[in-house]
């Protein structure tokens, strides 16, 4: 008999390496990390087909242009390499080791870490991913200054251009073009390294690599960044689609969200869709603990705003996503204000005065 309710385990990819090899146990123990800026904004293509057109994205004063090479824009699957690199570097930082932008590693260890196969085609796909990561140029005003200066957008604008990976080296056995890959070395960009040094990273669930569809990965990233360890987070469907960077109709995306709600297989969060308001609600499963959230111990992260405050914020900043503004406000303030609700509304009013409608 076929069960009426799909098994979430069947919806996820199989765990290809449930018992990691002995020689990579130190790698498997590294906590899975991702960069906050790339989780919140669509830096990566969601299609496996090469995308060679320049793409521009703008949201709440932040903007970025993604300029691909002739081999196509780096994809969300190529990003696995950077997630691995960030995880390894953060692991070393937490162990008190010195780190820099260069990382040498075994591609086999990486493939196991990201739940890939370890056949010949998987190694060749790894090399192709390096080429796309090196070829993709990011132009953006989303800064990761190493000095940590809290300059609100609107007062100054700092535009950066960088490659996701600045250089890469692959060593093959016997030096042959089709020889077995022995090791690889990459140098990440200063922009990414600054995020690591400032610990602008979040822990991801290991089942992230078991999500089958690129859009599911992207929705999880947004939920992880915006909801964090909060009980819930609500976002409009149209706004969520924009933030994913997906090239699909709102009708198609609505179907995607309904499937996520129906099958309930997203790691860390359940998904609820409000038909009346066309809103998506992420509900924490309680698997994300506050110690995993950057700056979670700060009072600014545990402030609770009144429900009426969001209505007043919408009036203060017409057209803006007040939930996104709330996150920006929390990141900007350094201590809990005496009147959080009034302070947040004032922040929204200033944003509207400086930036106008989005």
Each predicted region: which residue ranges?
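Short, surface-exposed alpha-helical recognition segments that flank or form part
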Residues: 317
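Charged, alpha-helix-forming regions
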Residues: 1-313, 327, 331-358
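Electrostatic, structured charged patches in enzyme active sites and in nucleic-acid/phosphate-binding
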Residues: 320
């Amino acid at each position: 008999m076929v069960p009426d309710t799909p098994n979430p385990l069947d919806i996820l990819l199989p765990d290809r390496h449930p018992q990691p090899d002995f020689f990579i146990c130190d790698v498997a123990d590294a906590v899975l990390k991702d960069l906050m800026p790339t989780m919140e904004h669509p830096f990566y293509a969601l299609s496996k087909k090469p995308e060679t057109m320049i793409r521009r994205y703008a949201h709440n004063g932040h903007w970025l242009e993604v300029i691909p090479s002739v081999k196509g824009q780096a994809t969300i699957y190529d990003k696995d390499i950077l997630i691995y690199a960030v995880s390894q570097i953060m692991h070393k930082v937490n162990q008190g080791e010195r780190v820099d932008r260069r990382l040498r590693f075994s591609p086999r260890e990486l493939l196991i870490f990201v739940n890939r196969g370890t056949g010949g085609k998987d190694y060749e796909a790894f090399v192709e991913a390096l080429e796309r990561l090196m070829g993709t140029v990011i132009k953006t005003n989303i800064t990761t200054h190493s000095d940590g200066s809290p300059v609100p957008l609107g007062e100054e604008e700092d535009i950066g251009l960088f490659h996701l990976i600045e250089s890469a080296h692959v060593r093959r056995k016997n030096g042959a073009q089709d020889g077995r890959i022995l090791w690889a070395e990459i140098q990440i960009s200063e922009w990414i390294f600054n995020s690591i040094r400032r610990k602008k990273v979040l822990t991801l669930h290991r089942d992230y690599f078991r999500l089958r569809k690129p859009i599911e990965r992207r929705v999880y990233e947004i939920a992880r960044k915006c909801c964090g360890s909060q009980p819930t987070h609500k976002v409009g469907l149209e706004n969520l689609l924009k933030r994913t960077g997906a090239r699909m109709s709102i009708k198609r995306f609505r179907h995607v969200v309904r499937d996520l709600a129906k099958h309930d297989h997203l790691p860390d969060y359940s998904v609820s869709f409000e038909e009346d308001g066309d809103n998506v609600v992420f509900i924490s499963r309680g698997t994300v603990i506050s110690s995993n959230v950057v700056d979670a111990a700060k009072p600014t992260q545990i402030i609770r705003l009144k429900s009426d405050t969001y209505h007043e914020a919408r009036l203060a900043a017409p057209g803006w996503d007040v939930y996104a503004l709330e996150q920006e406000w929390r990141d900007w303030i350094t201590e809990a204000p005496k009147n959080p609700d009034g302070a947040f509304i004032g922040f929204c009013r200033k944003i509207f005065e400086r930036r106008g409608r989005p």
